[in-house]
Amino acid sequence: TTVRLHTGDPCIYGAIREQMDILDEKNIAYDYCPGVSAFCGAASALNLEYTLPDISQSVIITRMEGRTPVPSKESIQSFAAHQATMVVFLSTGMLEELSRRLIEGGYTADTPAAIVYKATWPEQKTFVCTVGTLAKTAAENNITKTALMIIGDTVAADRKSVV
């Protein structure tokens, strides 16, 4: 028996489909065991709920284009127009551009945001900020990768202030 252990849930940015296709082609049996995605762990780390009445009833999970392209119809700007809670994976090194696109799409610079570094790991760190201060917050805390960003009013629903 061989195990391919993946952090989080392999159905979100886990390349699991490509791996299962190869196993299927070779007629190799396998089991797919779900995990807990970092976006769920991040909500727990921040004691927040992604969907709140009168604030947001939708969660958008996306990423900036990197090694893997993102279809143009799934641009950050088009998703930002919905003003729903947004979770952005795999984009920590592009936070200035992420902020620009979020604002271009309709969020304001003072929209609440958070950066969660290594969600659910022992070295987990959380930073509540705004769309306009994402890059500055990451730089001040030496966060360059392995983080996700949460955007939207649910981030500050029960918080007194954001930086």
Residue ranges and their predicted role:
Residues 1-2, 15, 58, 66, ...:
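A contiguous loop/helix-start segment that scaffolds small-molecule binding in enzyme catalytic cores
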Residues 7-82, 122-128:
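Class I SAM-dependent methyltransferase SAM-binding "motif I" and its flanking Rossmann-like core
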